[in-house]
C-alpha cells in the first residue's frame, strides 16, 4: 500500500514535466505553445474548413482533401459554429450555470471562512487539521473567484476583465478541483493508517508528514495547471460580438499528441488513482471497525461522506473530460464540451460541501476516537 502511494505521488510530480517537454520539442512551430486547451472550436475569419473534392457532383478523379488554410499570424478574432453560438447564448449558460455558481458563492464563502476560523483558533494542531485547513483554503480561493465567472455568464459569456485575470480564474477553477481531490485522498489515507495500522501511525511524525504532503499536493497541482496560465484563454467572437474566456480556442494553433496525453494523465492521476485509493482505504476502515465494535458505524457513515462528495462532484467531469478530448483528438468534434461545462458546474458544489464535512467530523469526535484524528 505504501509503495503504491509513493509511486502515484512520484508519477504525479513527473508527468507535468513530460507534458512540458512535449510542448517544447514540437518542431512545427517553435514560437507558439503546442498544447491548446480543447474547448469549443473557433476559426480565424480568413481560414476555411477541409473540403473533399470527391463530394463535388460529377467528380471522377482521385479523392483529394484540401487542408485547412490558416493565417501565419496569431488571430484573436474567431468565428464559431451555430451550435456553439446556440450554447453561448442559451439560458443554460446565461442563467442556470451562473445561478448554481451564485449558490456556491453564497454558501461557500461564509462556510469556508468559519471553517478556517475554527481551524485556526478553536482546534488544536493535529494532522487532520492541516489537511482540512488546506482544503478550506483551496475552496475559499475558488469561491472568491466565482463572482467573475458569474458576471461572465450573466453577461452572455462576455469576458470584460482582461486576459491575465481570465488565465488566473481558469487556473484557480481547475486547480481547486484537483487540489480538493488529492487532499480528500490524503485525509482518507490518514484515517486508514490511524485505524487499520494504529501502531505504525502513532510512530509517524504526523505534523511534519501532513505539512510535507500538503506542500507536494500544491506543487503538483501548480505544475499541472501551468498550461492553463501559459496559453491564451481570451478570444473575441465576431458573430456573437463577445469575448470568451477559456470557452473557445483557435483551431489554427499548432497541436501535438501531448494535448491528449496531458488531459488523460490529468484525469487518471488527478481523479482515478485518488478515487481507487479512497475506495481501498474506506473498505479497509469499514472492515476493521466493524470487526471490533458495531458502535463505530456512526463514524463510518461520517467518513463515507467524503466518498459521496468525491463521486457526485468529481466523477462526472473527469469521465467526460477523457471522452471529450479523445473524441476531439480522433474525430475533431467538440459536441461534448457543453456537457463537460455542466459537469464542472456540478463539481463546484464541492466547495460548499467540504466545510460541512469538517463540521460533521468535529461533532462526531469524542475521547474514544480522538486518536483517529491526531
From Swiss-Prot:
Main location: membrane
Glycan attachment points: 25, 82, 331
Residues making up the propeptide: 22-38
Keyword check for Cell membrane: yes
Site (Cleavage): 38-39
Residues exposed to the Cytoplasmic side: 121-128, 190-206, 281-297, 362-374
Membrane topology qualifier: Multi-pass membrane protein
Tissue/organ expression: Highest expression in the megakaryocytes of the bone marrow, lower in mature megakaryocytes, in platelets and in a variety of other tissues such as heart and gut.
Gene Ontology BP terms: blood coagulation; G protein-coupled receptor signaling pathway; ligand-gated ion channel signaling pathway; platelet activation; positive regulation of insulin secretion; response to wounding
Name recorded for this polypeptide: Proteinase-activated receptor 3
Organism of provenance: Homo sapiens
Amino acid at each position: 500500500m505504501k509503495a503504491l502511494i509513493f509511486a502515484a505521488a512520484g508519477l504525479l510530480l513527473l508527468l507535468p514535466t513530460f507534458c512540458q517537454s512535449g510542448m517544447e520539442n514540437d518542431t512545427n512551430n517553435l514560437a507558439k505553445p503546442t498544447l491548446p486547451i480543447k474547448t469549443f472550436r473557433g476559426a480565424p475569419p480568413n481560414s476555411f474548413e477541409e473540403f473533399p473534392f470527391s463530394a463535388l457532383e460529377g467528380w471522377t478523379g482521385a479523392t483529394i482533401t484540401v487542408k485547412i488554410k490558416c493565417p501565419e499570424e496569431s488571430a484573436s478574432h474567431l468565428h464559431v459554429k451555430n451550435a456553439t453560438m446556440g450554447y453561448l447564448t442559451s439560458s443554460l449558460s446565461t442563467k442556470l450555470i451562473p445561478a448554481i455558481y451564485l449558490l456556491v458563492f453564497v454558501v461557500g464563502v461564509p462556510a469556508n471562512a468559519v471553517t478556517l476560523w475554527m481551524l485556526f483558533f478553536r482546534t488544536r494542531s493535529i494532522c487532520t487539521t492541516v489537511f482540512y485547513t488546506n482544503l478550506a483554503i483551496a475552496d475559499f480561493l475558488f469561491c472568491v473567484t466565482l463572482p467573475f465567472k458569474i458576471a461572465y455568464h450573466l453577461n452572455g459569456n462576455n469576458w470584460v476583465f482582461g486576459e491575465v485575470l481570465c488565465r488566473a480564474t481558469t487556473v484557480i477553477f481547475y486547480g481547486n478541483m484537483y487540489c480538493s481531490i488529492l487532499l480528500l485522498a490524503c485525509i482518507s489515507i490518514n484515517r486508514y493508517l490511524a485505524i487499520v495500522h494504529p501502531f505504525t501511525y502513532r510512530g509517524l511524525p504526523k505534523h511534519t508528514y501532513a505539512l510535507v504532503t500538503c506542500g507536494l499536493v500544491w506543487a503538483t497541482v501548480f505544475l499541472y495547471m501551468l498550461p492553463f496560465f501559459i496559453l491564451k484563454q481570451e478570444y473575441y467572437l465576431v458573430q456573437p460580438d463577445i469575448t470568451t474566456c477559456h470557452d473557445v480556442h483557435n483551431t489554427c494553433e499548432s497541436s501535438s499528441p501531448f494535448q491528449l496525453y496531458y488531459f488523460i494523465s490529468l484525469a487518471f492521476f488527478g481523479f482515478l488513482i485518488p478515487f481507487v485509493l479512497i475506495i481501498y482505504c474506506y473498505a479497509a476502515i469499514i472492515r476493521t471497525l466493524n470487526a471490533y465494535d458495531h458502535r463505530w458505524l456512526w463514524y463510518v457513515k461520517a467518513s463515507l461522506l467524503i466518498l459521496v462528495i468525491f463521486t457526485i462532484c468529481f466523477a462526472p467531469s473527469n469521465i467526460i473530460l477523457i471522452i471529450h478530448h479523445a473524441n476531439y483528438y480522433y474525430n475533431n468534434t467538440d459536441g461534448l464540451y457543453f456537457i463537460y461545462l455542466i459537469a464542472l458546474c456540478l463539481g463546484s458544489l464541492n466547495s460548499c460541501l467540504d466545510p460541512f464535512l469538517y463540521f460533521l467530523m468535529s461533532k462526531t469526535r469524542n475521547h474514544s476516537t480522538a486518536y483517529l484524528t491526531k
